[in-house]
Amino acid sequence: VPNLQEVACVYGSKVGIAATKNNGKNWYYVGTANLPEPMQGQSTFWAPDVFKHKDTYYMIVTFIPGIHPFWGGDARLVFYKSKDLMNWDLVEEIEGTHGCIDASAFQMPDGTWKMWYKTPDSKTNTGVSKDLTTWKVTGKCEIDDVPHEGPIVFYWKNKYWNIIDECNLGYVGLHCYESDDATNWTYNSTILDKPGLRPDDFDQGRHCDVVVIGDRAFIFYFTHPGRTYKMDGMEVEENTWNYHRASIQIAELEYVDGKIVCDRDKYAKKVPSPIERKKK
């Protein structure tokens, strides 16, 4: 779409669906989820968190009415359920989440559910649900040491983990926190803060999700492969297609000497980065 102002290109988005037939080696585009919108008009969906409980799929997603040229809009978290991942029923707009985005939900040992999300002041707050029919925000902040977004919680290696994306235009990567109780978090490590070698993997890792399969954990993250950086690590900002373009990547997490590490180049074949291509 030509002549979009500032960040308007990231608004008006739907929830896209991709699928794989060979255990994640290759993916293909399926379409967009059929989500009843809480209000009429062209709106925006961001950061869906999808999980399954018994025979039903659930989704907590950021909903923003309208298209905006600058970061903003009346965001809130909305809760859906589905039997087939394509067609969804609206359960509720989660009360108390206006201005909040990027939810992640996980079931606790007592059977209740907990969610983590970004507040308007870029901290991680929480909410709870007893039976996935309604959510209640707690008002409790659990991570606030750096401004951040996109908290993702999972259980692996006998610990709870929360990976966040620091709100910074510099090259900072993703920060990992660990916890024994999914409430009190301690910084563990930073990953995906160095350029990778795979196609479109030259940028820092951004907003992620993690899938645990047995004893292995795989991180899905996105990059902006067309972006370049100054000597001080800050982005050279542009309002161009190449600057805004995003690519989804997958890598494996490893647990080494008590730390989460991620070698994004473990299976890579080197290709030239945007900077290397410009030098030719």
Walk through the language-model features, giving the residues of each:
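Carbohydrate-active catalytic/glycan-binding domains of CAZyme proteins
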Residues: 1-280
